[in-house]
Amino acid sequence: MPRMGGHGAHGGMPGEKAKDFKGTLKKLFKYMGAFKVHMIFVAVFAVCGTVFNIAGPKILGKATTEIFNGLVSKVSGGSGMDFGRIGQILLMTLGLYLISALCSFIQGLIMTGVSQKTTYRLRKEISEKINRMPMNYFDTKPVGEILSRVTNDVDTLGQSLNQSATQLITSVTTIIGVLVMMLSISPLMTLVAILILPISVLLLSFVMKHSQRYFRGQQEYLGNVNGQVEEIYSGHNIIKAFNKEEDVIREFNATNDKLYDSAWKSQFFSGMMMPVMQFIGNLGYVAVAILGGYLTIKNAIEVGDIQSFIQYVRNFTQPIQQVAQVANMLQSTAAASERVFEFLDEAEEDQTVPNPVSVEGLQGNVEFDHVHFGYNPDKIIINDFSAKVKEGQKIAIVGPTGAGKTTMIKLLMRFYDVNSGAIKIDGHNVKDFNRSELRQMFGMVLQDTWLFHGTIMENIRYGRLDATDEEVIQAAKAAHVHRFVQTLPGGYNMELNEEASNVSQGQKQLLTIARAILADPKILILGEATSSVDTRTEVLIQKAMDNLMRGRTSFVIAHRLSTIRDADLILVMREGDIVEQGTHEELLAKGGFYADLYNSQFESTDLTCA
């Protein structure tokens, strides 16, 4: 089954690796420069929250020492425990933890705002970028690949950025702060606790090294699975019509098996990390407890210090694990950022030109002057194409499939630029116009109609957004669609669904004609009336098109030659070249390629009727 793209191609899963990790993060931090003050506040509150949290175990240790000394005193016949002192210590600890929680809440609130504003800005810039991209970019990239950058990659960036930034600050602060507190209790116990670090680092490196390739595989196959699901859904009618269900299921299962294999291995290695780290941490607790007991007997430390130290050891190993997780999240952040910035850095169309030609007052004369073009420079498909079209003329472009008919239209609207030669409107090269102003001169109505989810009124008004309701209705009347709209529930306020399947194919084409009439363009690009409608609707479409073409230069891409007999000029294309041009009668009289095409269509019709 041909690849048609998928929504999930490279969605930025944890562990996906960027090609240029440092460069991408540097670019991301530069991009977030507008939030520099916010990030400073995030860092300050994160550090404060962590410091207050770190002080807690040391103070709790004093409470433990007070309780221990009180018990010993009571056994020895003394005054026993000082509950007032113990209460003061516990209240102080509670206050510290409350302040710590408040600081963490504030930094989390600020960081969430920063990450959401960053993703909002990225989505906005990507959306604007899409409108400035050349058509050949979309012709060479799967739809899902582009959509993934707007959805999956930006979401991944926002989520991982929100988590990794604060996690990194708090983890590093915790490691430094806990190390200082441990040293203040006992340098010897600190040395024993730190000995577990090299083992942890080695194991983490081993796990991360072996999991990376499986994460990349998981990401690749996830994109393939999403792409297959998208094309199966969009083409399910064709699949059923050709009885290809088993082939589709077999292909999907093969890709799904690969995804399962790589996902299982990546998650297995990722899942190994926590149990291994916990085992090493427990070994550290045992060593610290034994050494702490010995030092207490020697009166080198207090009993409460053992309890404080064990808490610090736990707090020391936990941020190390978090740093490892942050490393994974940063990889994910960098990978998603890289893909987003790659798209934002893509070459754009030049939207404006110095001293542009104004479209005001232009009549619609068009000239193709020795045009050469190929989608690939090594394969030219339009060779030395020349033609002159006068304003108001109806020009039919005919030829077999692949002759270059649609390509000529794309060049005329400057979706692509010619390799050599020139296309001129009223003597001005199309390259001398701003693209947006140039395209304002054109209206397009093709057999493949495009209507969006919204009301019928909104769909017609898309031709000119500042049009009044009355102007929209007048355009609909000119397109012979007004009466049909009035029969619908809600009339012009009826909502079309996402595929506009709640109106017929012919009605769709009438609506797009109404849209073009409202736009009032100088030059029209038309497909012939769709052949998949009843005779009455086809007559209405033809009348609407006649109203639309009146007084306008019109290019009609024709397949049924019987529909363009009244054209002022017929351009006959073959393998990218104009091989004949003239009126219908002139071309038939020549008995050339056009006559062969015309006669073959009527021979096919006669055979079908017979």
Identify the role of each PLM range:
Residues 33-37, 135-136, 154-161, 165, ...:
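An intracellular "coupling" helix at the cytosolic face of ABC transporter transmembrane type-1 domains
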Residues 39-103, 184-188, 299-303:
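Transmembrane helix-loop-helix hairpins at lipid-water interfaces of multipass membrane proteins
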Residues 352-353, 359-610:
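ABC-type nucleotide-binding domain
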Residues 24, 32, 111, 131-176, ...:
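Juxtamembrane loop-to-helix connectors within ABC transporter transmembrane domains
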Residues 181-195, 265, 269-338, 343-344:
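Helix-loop-helix
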Residues 11-16, 116, 124-148, 152-154, ...:
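Short intracellular "coupling" helices and adjacent cytoplasmic loop segments at the cytosolic face
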Residues 34, 38-51, 62, 163-217, ...:
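Transmembrane helices of ABC transporter permease
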Residues 37-62, 93, 108-112, 158-173, ...:
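Alpha-helical segments in transporter systems
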